[in-house]
C-alpha cells in the first residue's frame, strides 16, 4: 500500500518482473516480496478501526501477512523437486465502473476474467490444462462474477478455480464475510500452500492470477471508479 496509489496486484507483478529479469539474463537471482496489513488498509481506504462501522457482506478482510520468493536461473541442487515459472501473461486495466471499496471482488473480477481468457487464447489451451486456476482475492462474490463472465465467453473454469481469499480464512468460524484480501493474501497462500501442493505432486501446473485494483485515498473519497488489474503466472512442477 503506497501513499498515493494502491496497486493490489504486487504479488503477480513482482513474480512476472522477477521472472523476466532472470530469463533475460539481467540477474541470476531475483527476490519478489509483498505484504499487506489489515489495520493500515482499513484506516487508509475504509474507516478507522475505532469507528466501529458495520461491514457489508460483500466486504473482505485484508490479510496481515507477507511472502517472498527467490527466482533463479539455475535449479536448486538441494531441492528434491524443482518448481519453475513457465510463462507469464501480462494483464491490462479493466474498468467496469464499480466504485464501492467494500465490494472489491466486483471491482477486480472483470480484470481476472480478461486475463484468464487471454492466457488460454495465447497458449492455445483449455482450462483443464491447469490443475488449478488460482485468483488472489476475489472472495465469494468476485468468484461468482468471474465464473459468469468467462461462461459468457464460452469458458468454464468452475472445476479448476480456487481463490486465495476464500481459502485463507475459515468463514464459518471467523465470519470474514466475502473472504480475505490484500497483497499478502495471495503471497502467503502461494508460499504456504500452493508451492507445497506442487512439490508433493498433488498438482503439476497452476495458473496463478493475483488480483488487484487501482485506487488512492483521494480517488476513493471523490467517488471515482475503482479499475481492476491482474497478471497471470504459470507455475509448474518439473
Q: In which residue ranges do the predicted regions lie?
A:
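Active-site-proximal alpha-helical scaffold in enzymes
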Residues: 8-32, 69-74, 181-201
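A structural signal for small-residue-enriched, beta-sheet-centric alpha/beta enzyme cores
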Residues: 108, 124-127, 134-144
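Short, small-residue-biased leader/transition segments that mark boundaries at the very start
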Residues: 1-7
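Flexible, glycine-rich active-site loops centered on histidine and acidic residues
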Residues: 33-62
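Short glycine/threonine-rich loop-to-helix capping motif typified by GTGT followed
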Residues: 138-153, 218-225
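Acidic, glycine-rich active-site loops and adjacent beta-strand->loop/helix elements
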Residues: 8-9, 34-43, 91-92, 210-215
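A short beta-alpha structural unit
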Residues: 131-140, 167, 178-179
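Condensing-enzyme catalytic core mediating Claisen C-C bond formation in acyl metabolism
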Residues: 51-117, 122-125, 159-167, 205-211, ...
Amino acid at each position: 500500500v503506497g501513499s498515493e496509489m494502491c496497486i493490489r496486484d504486487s504479488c503477480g507483478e513482482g513474480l512476472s518482473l522477477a521472472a523476466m529479469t532472470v530469463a533475460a539474463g539481467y540477474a541470476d537471482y531475483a527476490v519478489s516480496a509483498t505484504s499487506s496489513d489489515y489495520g493500515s488498509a482499513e484506516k487508509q481506504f475504509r474507516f478507522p478501526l475505532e469507528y466501529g462501522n458495520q461491514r457489508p457482506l460483500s466486504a473482505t478482510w485484508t490479510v496481515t501477512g507477507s511472502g517472498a520468493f527467490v527466482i533463479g536461473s539455475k535449479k536448486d541442487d538441494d531441492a528434491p523437486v524443482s518448481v519453475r515459472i513457465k510463462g507469464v501473461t501480462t494483464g491490462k486495466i479493466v474498468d467496469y465502473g464499480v466504485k464501492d471499496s467494500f465490494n472489491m471482488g466486483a471491482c477486480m473480477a472483470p480484470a481476472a476474467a480478461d486475463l484468464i481468457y487471454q492466457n488460454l487464447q495465447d497458449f492455445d489451451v483449455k482450462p483443464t490444462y491447469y490443475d488449478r486456476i488460482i485468483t488472489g482475492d476475489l472472495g465469494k462474490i468476485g468468484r461468482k462474477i468471474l465464473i459468469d463472465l468467462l461462461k459468457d465467453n464460452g469458458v468454464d473454469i468452475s472445476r479448476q478455480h480456487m481463490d486465495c481469499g476464500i481459502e485463507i480464512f475459515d468463514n464459518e468460524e471467523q465470519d470474514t464475510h466475502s473472504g480475505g484480501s490484500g497483497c499478502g493474501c495471495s503471497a502467503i497462500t502461494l508460499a504456504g500452500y500452493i508451492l507445497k501442493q506442487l512439490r508433493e505432486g498433488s498438482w503439476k501446473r497452476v495458473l496463478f492470477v493475483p488480483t488487484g485494483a487501482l485506487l488512492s485515498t483521494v480517488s476513493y473519497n471523490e467517488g471515482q471508479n475503482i479499475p481492476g488489474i491482474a497478471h497471470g503466472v504459470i507455475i509448474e512442477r518439473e
